[in-house]
Structure formats: C-alpha cells, structure tokens
Amino acid sequence: MISFIVTTYNLADWLLRRCLTSIVAQGLARDEYEIIVVDDESTVSPRHVVDEFATQVNITLHIQRHKRQGAARNLALCHAQGDWVQFVDGDDYLFEGTISPLLHIAEKNNLDLLMFGFREVHDDSVKRIRIENNWSFNISTGDDYMLHHNLLGSCCMLMFKRILLDDSQYDAPLRFTEGIYIEDEEFATKLVWRAQRMAKIDTVVYAYYQRAGSTVHSRSHEHTDELFRNYIVVLERLLHFESSLGDNTHDGFTRKVRTLAVDVLRRSLREPNWKERWMDSVHQLRSLGVYPLPAVHYSMKYSVFRFLTMCAMGRRILHWIEKSQNRL
C-alpha cells in the first residue's frame, strides 16, 4: 500500500479537487492506497472537498494550528500506514496512470527510493502523457547518486519506503524541521543518503503548478530575509549531521551540502540589493566553513562559478547571468 500525503493551506476548492482527482486516477485498487490530507488551519476548511472523495477512497483529513508545511507532513507521517510514501502539495497533481508502473518497478527491483521527473504547469487542466513500458534506469546508493548528480531539493519527486524514515540503524527517526521554509532541502538530502538502492527515472510523473502568491514565489522583503535565514539553518543542520557520519560513506552528501551553499550565493545575486546580500551570505557561509567554495571539480558549471566568485568582475558577470535567467 502507498500513502499519499497532501498538504493544504487556503487553497481554492478546484485546486485541491484536481489534486485528489489525480490521485484517484492512478488506477490503484481501493485497498492499495490511502490519502492523508493535512490542512494548516485554512480560513475555510477543505472538509467539504475531502468528503466528496470519501466514498471512493480511504481518505482522512487532519487539521493543525498554523505550523507550516513541515509540521503538516510530520503529522501525516504519524498516521501513514502504507509501505510507500508519496508527498503531493495540494496545488499540484500527478499525471494519470503514472504511480502504478513506478510501484511495480520499485518493488520488482527491491528499491528503497525512486526518483522521477516533473513538469511545470500553468493552467487548470490535468494533462495526459504517454507512459513508456520500458523505462531505463540505473540502481545506486543514494550517496553515489548525489556524488554524480545535482539533487533537487523537493521530496515530492521522491517515492520511498516508509521504513526508511525509522530505520533502527539511525539514532533518530527522519522528520521535517518545523517552522521554516525549504524544509524539503534537509529532508530530501538525508532521505536520499539513507537509500541503499535507489533509481532515477526521467518519466514525468509530477505536475508542479506555478501560481502567483505561493511561498516559493513571494517577493516581499520580509519573506526574502526569512528565506535566507532558513537556508543557513538548513545548512547548519546538514553540516551537523555530516559531522556525525564518521566512517560512513558520504562524499555525495558533502557535494550536496556544498552545492546548497552555491544555491545561497546564486539567490543572493538575483536580489535588487545583491552586493549587500552577497556580502551577508558570504559572511554566514564562511562562518559555517563552506566558503570559499572548495576547489573540487563537481561539474564544469560548479568550477566556473567558483572561479568567478573570486573577483569583483566575476561576481558582476554572475549577477548579470542570474538576473537574465531570472527574467525567463
């Protein structure tokens, strides 16, 4: 069985209805899945939307006092009964008929975790995509994957075994850090590192809906300040975890942490007050020991970026590049 965990906060009815409809349309038998909806104390409860699906599927609704998405997901994990877990944000959806083939691949190959593709969408239609029967993939450890690929900091593109969260070989269960943005970055990095058998399939499964006013697109000064503070919090927590790994293989984990520092710098370069934001970010990253960026050839892009950060003219070039790309 797979547990679909859906988080909501002040969503329009049609968005949540579209999300839940896409889960029901996966072609799974009723006893093969459950839907756990957690609402973060919306102004208007989504119960009437959830009740529309009560006769079709095993679905439950939980209400929490406004604690943000990390706490909502943790609450859902406490109630999850499935062998597998799939997160879906309430304003996103899954392309029809994609999850069942993924489950077959994951179980046939004894995977701990399966990563898949996504597509940005900007309308209200559930599009269909062609599902290939013979998907190609390579199996590796999570750490080896992160050593050779950039890991997207979103847990919604990861279908994983629930037992991976509470594996007895680790000191504590894996849960989301609560009360912050970008909680996905920490959770996804630790989760993928735990996977001994994982695969990445490029097939598009997840529809990532772009809407004005979402937390990832908010541009208020207060939100931007908090976002940068949260990046530092996540980096601190990942570095602390890294220091506890000892002899465990974690070269890929280290690469992910270093590239997350690059993300902070790139975001700094996109800001209107980019020079001040850059200096503040450098100060914070230096105090954590992740700046200057290490001279490691993770990729050509990383090496070029690192080289350009070392002089004022290089930073101006990077600012121009990031500003140009951000307009697209």
Describe these PLM feature segments.
Residues 1-3, 22, 34, 186:
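Cell-envelope/extracellular polymer assembly enzymes that use nucleotide-activated donors
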Residues 11-26:
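Short, well-formed alpha-helical segments that are part of the catalytic scaffolds
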Residues 39-48:
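A conserved acidic beta->alpha catalytic loop
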Residues 64-73, 77, 180-181:
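A short, glycine-/small-residue-rich helix N-cap motif at loop->alpha-helix starts
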Residues 69, 90-199, 208-225:
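Donor-binding/catalytic cores of nucleotide-activated saccharide
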Residues 85:
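Short aromatic/hydrophobic "clamp" motif used to bind/position activated sugar donors
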Residues 205-212, 218-247, 273-290:
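Catalytic core of nucleotide-sugar-dependent glycosyltransferases
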Residues 269-328:
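Membrane-interface aromatic/basic loop that binds lipid-linked glycans or pyrophosphate carriers
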